From Swiss-Prot:
Subcellular location: Cytoplasm
Family: Belongs to the MatP family.
Protein known as: Macrodomain Ter protein
Protein function: Required for spatial organization of the terminus region of the chromosome (Ter macrodomain) during the cell cycle. Prevents early segregation of duplicated Ter macrodomains during cell division. Binds specifically to matS, which is a 13 bp signature motif repeated within the Ter macrodomain.
Gene Ontology CC: cytoplasm
NCBIfam families (alphabetical): PRK05097.1
GO molecular function terms listed in the Swiss-Prot or TrEMBL record: sequence-specific DNA binding
GO biological process: cell division; regulation of DNA-templated transcription
Domain of life: Bacteria
Record keywords, A-Z: Cell cycle, Cell division, Cytoplasm, DNA-binding
InterPro entries, per the entry: Arc_rbn_hlx_hlx, MatP, MatP_C, MatP_N, MatP_N_sf
Subunit record text: Homodimer.
Length: 148
């Protein structure tokens, strides 16, 4: 396991996930009867600040269709949570027009790099080009001064 499990935090994430699914109208319980579904969902709603009750509720009442989805959602949340702690693993998003993204993507594949590596490479190339241009301009002025 790459990321440490935080039981209380993950119970809260599970609670948030299940309540959101319930509010979207999905049956989060293993029961077919609507009144029983509502009662069990209300029971889960009331156990928000009690991680052990949330885990017990999940063990006893969770719909058979949800365990895999729930585990995937928690695994993704755990990854984002731990990656967000360190600056070098923290993800940022930028808005790109589709045409720009497409060109960048093609260039990345051609260079066999990730998008981030390609952007860094392009910035480095531009900076070295600017530095070269400055050196050339300085050499031209010194040559002109020398020839006077």
């Amino acid at each position: 396991m790459k990321y440490q499990k935080l039981e209380n935090q993950e119970s809260n994430w599970k609670w948030i996930y299940l309540i959101r699914k319930h509010r979207e109208g999905e049956n989060i319980t293993r029961y077919e009867e609507r009144s029983l579904q509502e009662a069990k969902a209300q029971e889960l709603l009331e156990s928000q600040n009690y991680p052990s009750q949330i885990e017990e509720w999940i063990k006893n009442h969770l719909s058979p269709a949800l365990p895999i989805k729930l585990d995937q959602a928690i695994r993704a949340r755990r990854k984002r949570f731990f990656n967000g702690e360190k600056q070098h693993t923290k993800k940022k998003s930028i808005d790109l027009e589709y045409a720009v993204w497409l060109r960048l993507s093609k260039y990345s594949r051609k260079m066999k790099m990730t998008l981030s590596e390609t952007i860094t490479y392009m910035i480095d190339e531009r900076e070295s080009k600017a530095q070269f241009e400055n050196q050339m301009a300085a050499m031209k002025t010194s040559l002109k001064n020398l020839l006077k």
